[in-house]
């Protein structure tokens, strides 16, 4: 395999149920992978150099999650001669709450684990991923999941097939700014997966994000006015949002009514991560 996909995710709900002494928030969420991916290519070298060939403008290699993931894996494996040239085709919106950076890091760990001949088990890679970010482990886990803790306690869930209209407002939201906001609800009562299956659940981050970027409220309001959707919510800390539909035709009908000043895409939900068996 020359090209490795890094799929986006949706948070079908996201509750903040507490806060640890170290400042990390305790969450409940359902992660769903969708068929919209970044694509990564890895050119293996043996000169000890790890380089991202096409860094996102404004991002340094010190901050780049792909480079950080590669360096962390090599450091723990203990072979400094391992090198790689990374090329990223970026399709997932930045700062949108779709997990693009975390997914890129996870795909880097999954791919280099094989390409470098390390062959560690997924559980070990998930522990490395958690050092890079709370959302990284689920992409290595490879299954849609009910998540608890800071997002690392994962329980596989089988979700019904669904299609989504995902809207992409022209704004970015800082995850850190949302989670440090004094207005964030941090004491939502925990629920069971069965309650989510019966339609319970919301996104506690939505009100904060809407105050930071009022355009989010307007776009969410438009989605909620459309007929045929089974769920409308912001994903993660935003700014992207989604409406869920039981069929592609229903999703495309609503997307066809999208006002000219709004943008997005139609996509299907995935049953598994495309690299779950790699």
Swiss-Prot record:
Q: Which cysteine-cysteine pairs are annotated as disulfide bonds in the entry?
A: none
So where does ATP get bound? 93-103
| SUPFAM superfamilies, per the entry | GHMP Kinase, C-terminal domain, Ribosomal protein S5 domain 2-like
| Pfam families in alphabetical order | GHMP_kinases_C, GHMP_kinases_N
Family matches, as InterPro entries: GHMP_kinase_C_dom, GHMP_kinase_C_sf, GHMP_kinase_N_dom, IspE, Ribosomal_Su5_D2-typ_SF, Ribsml_uS5_D2-typ_fold_subgr
Please give the family membership noted in the entry: Belongs to the GHMP kinase family. IspE subfamily.
Record-given protein name: 4-diphosphocytidyl-2-C-methyl-D-erythritol kinase
Organism whose genome encodes this protein: Nitrosomonas europaea (strain ATCC 19718 / CIP 103999 / KCTC 2705 / NBRC 14298)
Organism classification: Bacteria, Pseudomonadati, Pseudomonadota, Betaproteobacteria, Nitrosomonadales
């Amino acid at each position: 395999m020359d090209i490795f996909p890094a799929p986006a995710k949706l948070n079908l709900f996201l509750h903040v149920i507490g806060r640890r002494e170290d400042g990390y928030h305790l969450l409940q969420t359902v992660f769903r992978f969708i068929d919209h991916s970044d694509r990564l290519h890895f050119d293996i070298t043996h000169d000890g150099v790890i380089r991202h060939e096409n860094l996102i403008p404004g991002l340094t290699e010190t901050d780049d999650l792909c480079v950080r993931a590669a360096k962390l894996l090599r450091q723990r494996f203990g072979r400094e001669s391992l090198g790689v040239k990374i090329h990223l085709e970026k399709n997932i919106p930045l700062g949108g709450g779709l997990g693009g950076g975390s997914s890129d890091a996870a795909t880097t760990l999954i791919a280099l684990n094989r390409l470098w001949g390390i062959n560690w088990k997924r559980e070990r890679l998930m522990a490395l991923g958690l050092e890079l970010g709370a959302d990284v482990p689920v992409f290595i886990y490879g299954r849609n999941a009910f998540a608890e803790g800071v997002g690392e306690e994962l329980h596989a869930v089988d979700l019904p097939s669904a299609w989504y209209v995902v809207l992409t407002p022209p704004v970015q939201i800082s995850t850190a700014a949302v989670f440090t906001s004094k207005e964030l609800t941090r004491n939502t009562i925990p629920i069971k997966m069965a309650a989510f299956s019966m339609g319970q659940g919301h996104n506690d981050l939505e009100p904060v994000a809407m105050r930071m970027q009022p355009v989010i409220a307007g776009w969410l309001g438009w989605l909620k006015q459309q007929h045929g959707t089974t769920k409308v919510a912001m994903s993660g800390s935003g700014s992207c949002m989604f409406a869920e539909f039981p069929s592609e035709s229903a999703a495309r009908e609503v997307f066809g009514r999208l006002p000219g000043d709004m943008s997005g895409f139609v996509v299907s939900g995935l049953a598994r991560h495309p690299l779950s068996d790699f």
